[in-house]
UniProtKB/Swiss-Prot annotation:
Region of interest: Disordered: 162-183
Name of the protein in its database record: Uncharacterized protein C12orf60
InterPro entries documented for this protein: DUF4533
Top-level taxon in the UniProt lineage: Eukaryota
Species of provenance: Homo sapiens (Human)
Composition-biased stretches (Basic and acidic residues): 162-174
Pfam families: DUF4533
Signal peptide: none
Amino acid sequence: MSSESEKDKERLIQAAKMFFFHVQDLASVINTLTELFSRSMNTQILLMAVKNNSYIKDFFEQMLKIFKEMQSVVDARHDKIQKESLCSKVAMAMCSVVQKSTNVEELHQSAKEVFKSAHTPVIISVLNSSNILGSLESSLSHLMKFPIMNLQLSDFYTEDTKEQSDVTTSERTRSPPGSSKTTMIDTLKKLQDVLKTEDSKNPTKSAADLLEQIVKAMGPILEILQKAIKTMEMNISVFKKASDK
């Protein structure tokens, strides 16, 4: 086999592993975001459950469902805020307490209660910023057009749990567990068949090119989710500190 063919085969193997770990990372990040969102918005959205025998189509559909549920909650809460602004609610609440009592401790307690709920509009602002949820839905819809939806996660890569238990994701990517030659050949063949293009003279290269494109498209989605989580956590922390004073 030529060095070029070997290089293309290695590219396909590496792209398949990267896809596998991207899916795992996405599931983890989305569940973190979902938990944070549910607590902040006083709602309940089911977390993702991804297994090695999960179909890629089911995984992306779960993601889309979560984003749509979040958007629905955000839209409903945003409409409510538009009708009765937070500033008015704060002013009215504080004026009411002042009128009823001049007790400093009572005023302090009232302020804490106001700030406890003040982070909700911040969550809405973060998710509405640059149409994050809409952009994520659009990116996922684009990814679902690729011909890998009927594959299972294990078709891309299979971890040796015992061998990998104490290894980080990045280390796993660099140092994969020893796979049998038969399994490797089966994986390559399956990916080549699914990702092949018409009249391709080099199916391995074509498959590697397309899978690398898919992995590249997943990167920004993961980055957006991580930034959204960081921003939400930071803003919630600020308001928590304010409410504790």
